[in-house]
């Protein structure tokens, strides 16, 4: 697959720039890498947690918000795992550019959006479910009627991508590493088709 042919206005495709290898880059020096990529069990948990939360919101059961509750949705797809999106997410995660979005991650099939999470603990690696819940919790600042604006995007953008009604597939890359005695779990999820278009409703209200 020639990713150099996939064009984004924002820049060069991640796989074109860094190649197909998911081996941690020399940029990861100083981090003791314990594992690269989600396990099969974690992949299942990622999809399950996304769909559990998407269904909760779709059914109108999410009471948090500014104001809450969030309206029910009529177009909330169930997400499935996409290996290609996961591979591209992993190539980027393995560059160790922590909490930075890559410039181009599209596939031939989709424009692709991205969520990034990072958490650490002194005694265990935080679970993927914990990381995804960080995104979910942004709902507390979200007003459905205002939608996504330049002003609120930094506070709610992970939540809005997570429950973007039209998104169909998710694929994630991850690293677990030790740095300064902290056990850190770093997760990047890529979403196709992408969400978070300014001025569009995040899902259709029921």
From Swiss-Prot:
Belongs to the CRISP family. Venom allergen 5-like subfamily. PANTHER family: CYSTEINE-RICH SECRETORY PROTEIN-RELATED (PTHR10334). It holds the Pfam family CAP. Residues 48-191 form the SCP domain. One of its GO terms (cellular component) is extracellular region. It comes from Polistes gallicus. This is Venom allergen 5. Expressed by the venom gland. It is found in: Secreted. InterPro entries: Allrgn_V5/Tpx1_CS, CAP_dom, CAP_sf, CRISP-related, V5_allergen-like. The keyword Transport does not apply. Its main location: secreted. Disulfide bonds join 4-16, 8-104, 28-96, 172-189.
